[in-house]
Amino acid sequence: EYVGVDACAVNLMRPAMYGAYHHITVMGREDEPCTRMYDVVGSLCENNDKFAIDRMLPEIKKGDLLFIHDAGAHGFAMGYNYNGKLKSAELLLKEDGTVEMIRRAETPEDYFATFDFCDILRNID
């Protein structure tokens, strides 16, 4: 079975690039038994955009949030804007269980900020 997620190799390239393992949990159901086998796949149109292959997880339903652990510095540092995908925000899970946003998500304005190839963009109303 496949589980498609909003994230993709743009956000975490290591599994797609060389099969790196990242533990995955289903938020709020961490203590449920892992009874289903899934390929967890990203949103790119590439056959290697996968976060996990044959991973045992609890049953996943539409709307569930998946936590991909130990992404750390690899997410942003190896990220890229393939297919026009914007980089996600980065969240830090602290030892006390609190979460802090340490980098905001990119916006379309960020994506086009370095373009300076002609006046066409400046003259759009």
What do the PLM-derived regions correspond to, one by one?
Residues 1-125:
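Charged (often Lys/Glu-rich) extended helix/loop segments that serve as interaction or gating elements
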